[in-house]
């Protein structure tokens, strides 16, 4: 990944990305609303390696999201921020819904839908 001054990095996904970020969408500032997960760690590393570059890190992860829910919010929570780079970590809830919601098939995301949804993003 080649960063440039002023680059915008956006991290999105499920709870693995969210990890307590501020709402509505967390953007790295003085009070670090990025949460305590990997977006926070990456932001710290980037700012240590590229101080003064004005690299803008955004976290739009949502705990509990499936790939279907991520696709539904893709425009507002990803594209509208006009990121230069996007990191997506999604999928555990697609698997988990098979087990925690066995009587709610409308909440379940199978492998074919998962692959198609990610391909469409």
Predicted regions and their residues:
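Short, flexible micro-motifs
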Residues: 16-18, 23, 64-67, 94
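Alpha-helical cap/lid subdomain in secreted, periplasmic
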Residues: 2-5, 36-56, 65-121
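Short glycine-rich His-centered loop
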Residues: 2-32
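Residue-level recognition of beta-strand->loop/alpha-helix junctions
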Residues: 59-61
């Amino acid at each position: 990944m080649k960063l440039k001054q002023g680059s915008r990095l956006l991290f999105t996904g499920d709870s693995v990305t969210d990890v307590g970020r501020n709402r509505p969408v967390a953007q790295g500032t003085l009070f670090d609303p990025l949460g305590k997960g990997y977006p926070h760690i990456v932001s710290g590393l980037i700012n240590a390696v590229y101080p003064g570059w004005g690299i803008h890190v955004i976290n739009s992860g949502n705990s509990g999201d499936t790939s279907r829910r991520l696709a539904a919010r893709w425009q507002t929570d990803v594209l509208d921020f006009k990121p230069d780079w996007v990191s997506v970590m999604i999928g555990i809830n697609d698997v988990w819904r098979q087990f925690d919601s066995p009587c709610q098939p409308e909440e379940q995301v199978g492998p074919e839908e998962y692959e198609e949804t990610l391909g469409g993003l």
